[in-house]
Amino acid sequence: MGILIPAWVDDRLVPVDKLEAHEKGLKHKAVSVFAVRDMDILIQRRALGKYHTPGLWANTCCTHPDWDESASTCAVRRLREELGITGLYPEYRHRLEYHADVGNGMVENEVVDVFLAHVRGPLQVVPNPDEVMEIRWIGYHDLLAEVQRYPERFTPWLKIYLHHHADTIFGPDLIISAKA
């Protein structure tokens, strides 16, 4: 048995092996974080060793909480584990649900708590090569244009967040400023 995450089985929240949850398409909890500095968003390219969506661009970090872990604790933990980021305390923005085929017989059927972390000042980022192969800061408008032009380069959930939940995640200031 691998990592246990919170998933719904017969309308009950129970601990389920993470791989099993994806193979069976079980609805499960997830956490996504966006780090924003001025008008730029930190995105990551997933490591090639990931069991689904390897090599695709995603938001700053995304994961599943451990069975007994709160979403906010999970967000801080995964910023540290995936990107070596400490000292950021993401604020809760939104809960959303989505369902997406992520290839290799895997399905994301997630109830996601989304967090936004405002970066003020220098930020040391040290990607974990088992998780992340590349990072970059990109403006909101530029990210939308890239997703439109090369959708195959981005994870399904990032496209869903940008196309259907951006106002709630980022707020009007980032979106309006990015359009100007």
Swiss-Prot record:
Pfam families attached here? NUDIX (PF00293)
* Annotated compartments: Cytoplasm
Q: Which cofactor does it need?
A: Mg(2+); Mn(2+)
The lineage's top-level taxon is: Bacteria
Entries under PROSITE patterns matching the protein: NUDIX
List positions binding Mg(2+). C62, E82
Binding of Mn(2+): at which residues? H22, H28, H64, E108, E110
Q: Which family does it belong to?
A: Belongs to the IPP isomerase type 1 family.
Q: Which HAMAP family match?
A: Idi (MF_00202)
Q: Could you tell me what this protein is called?
A: Isopentenyl-diphosphate Delta-isomerase
The species is: Ruegeria pomeroyi (strain ATCC 700808 / DSM 15171 / DSS-3)
